[in-house]
Amino acid sequence: MTEAPDVDLADGNFYASREARAAYRWMRANQPVFRDRNGLAAASTYQAVIDAERQPELFSNAGGIRPDQPALPMMIDMDDPAHLLRRKLVNAGFTRKRVKDKEASIAALCDTLIDAVCERGECDFVRDLAAPLPMAVIGDMLGVRPEQRDMFLRWSDDLVTFLSSHVSQEDFQITMDAFAAYNDFTRATIAARRADPTDDLVSVLVSSEVDGERLSDDELVMETLLILIGGDETTRHTLSGGTEQLLRNRDQWDLLQRDPSLLPGAIEEMLRWTAPVKNMCRVLTADTEFHGTALCAGEKMMLLFESANFDEAVFCEPEKFDVQRNPNSHLAFGFGTHFCLGNQLARLELSLMTERVLRRLPDLRLVADDSVLPLRPANFVSGLESMPVVFTPSPPLG
């Protein structure tokens, strides 16, 4: 690409077009803080993203993280100290011990999902393995019964549609219906946990207290919604997109099978490569010049996490999928005060499923090696919509 890309960074089709990374490459080389055809500013280099995240007093979350929508009443759209208090309250459900305690149940769930397809010799990796796993894990934490998981998956997809791109009136209504249903379900769950606490996440959040403060029912609804969306879509897309790269780079697949100790590094490379959260916005609190571009108070600047993860100044041969990449300081979980609260849980899910796929479906392969797999046209969280795979049938464990 020799000319400035003529793109709309708020249009989900840009992220599904397979042209985004070439556009990012031009931005990083020529205009680290780029303006799209509509004037939206975007930080494209690793250093620009980091520099913005290190100055939350100048680059604020409080105006909303989406380019064309106002802030929502959840901690991701807050600055400190309000954000820090809310984060401390929610963090009670994501301590290292609570995540570690879920390992056995997540491992069993991975085997159950593989059991459901292993005798067939074929499946859609997204539909049958990548999508059900995080939804089941998050669903269990939010009090969702197994028979309700498909319903929750639909709600999550519908709600992310609203946050992800230009939406039609029909899509807007679908989103509002999904939120109303989620709101009713969650308020009923909150009431039940107040009356009869269990060990699930909702019970922990209901009883969480910091400096005498507790979460109200309204706050519980919004923060569990953030957990649902963040915990479902991101892990799903990393698992599917990362596995796609292992299958397209067979030497990396074979390397992991020979040496499973490389799996932690492979998970980090899957996260870097897929960068499921494509971007977030920050609002300027003052006029400034930033990496060569004049910015005005009140405007939004997009942080292009995916572009930062492919910055040649930071990552050697960034277009090469390398499970032994070291160092690998990717920004898939963000950076700074808003670093992803669920990163330990996501890494655990990715590791447990990938280890089992490598071991139980050792000759897993794409149905068509040269196929271009469809990406979700979304400007926030995006990844593969479908990935047909085949493998040698094997008996289930259960």
Curated annotation (Swiss-Prot):
The keyword Transmembrane belongs to this UniProt entry's keyword annotation: no
An example Gene Ontology molecular-function term: steroid hydroxylase activity
Family: Belongs to the cytochrome P450 family.
A GO cellular component entry from the record: peptidoglycan-based cell wall
Task performed by this protein: Involved in the utilization of cholesterol as the sole carbon and energy source by degrading the side chain during infection. Primarily catalyzes the sequential oxidation of the terminal methyl of cholest-4-en-3-one into (25R)-26-hydroxycholest-4-en-3-one (alcohol), (25R)-26-oxocholest-4-en-3-one (aldehyde), to finally yield the carboxylic acid (25R)-3-oxocholest-4-en-26-oate.
Organism: Mycobacterium tuberculosis (strain ATCC 25618 / H37Rv)
Keywords tagged on the record: Cholesterol metabolism, Heme, Iron, Lipid degradation, Lipid metabolism, Metal-binding, Monooxygenase, NADP, Oxidoreductase, Steroid metabolism, Sterol metabolism, Virulence
Record-listed heme binding positions: 340
GO BP term, pick one: cholesterol catabolic process
Keyword NADP included in the entry's annotation: yes
Induction (free text): By cholesterol.
Cofactor annotation: heme
UniProt cross-references to PROSITE patterns, sorted A to Z: CYTOCHROME_P450
Catalysed reaction, written as an equation: cholest-4-en-3-one + 6 reduced [2Fe-2S]-[ferredoxin] + 3 O2 + 5 H(+) = (25R)-3-oxocholest-4-en-26-oate + 6 oxidized [2Fe-2S]-[ferredoxin] + 4 H2O; cholest-4-en-3-one + 2 reduced [2Fe-2S]-[ferredoxin] + O2 + 2 H(+) = (25R)-3-oxocholest-4-en-26-ol + 2 oxidized [2Fe-2S]-[ferredoxin] + H2O; (25R)-3-oxocholest-4-en-26-ol + 2 reduced [2Fe-2S]-[ferredoxin] + O2 + 2 H(+) = (25R)-3-oxocholest-4-en-26-al + 2 oxidized [2Fe-2S]-[ferredoxin] + 2 H2O; (25R)-3-oxocholest-4-en-26-al + 2 reduced [2Fe-2S]-[ferredoxin] + O2 + H(+) = (25R)-3-oxocholest-4-en-26-oate + 2 oxidized [2Fe-2S]-[ferredoxin] + H2O
Pathway: Steroid metabolism; cholesterol degradation
Regulation of activity: Inhibited by econazole, clotrimazole and miconazole.
Assigned EC number: 1.14.15.28
Domain of life of the source: Bacteria
Record-given protein name: Steroid C26-monooxygenase
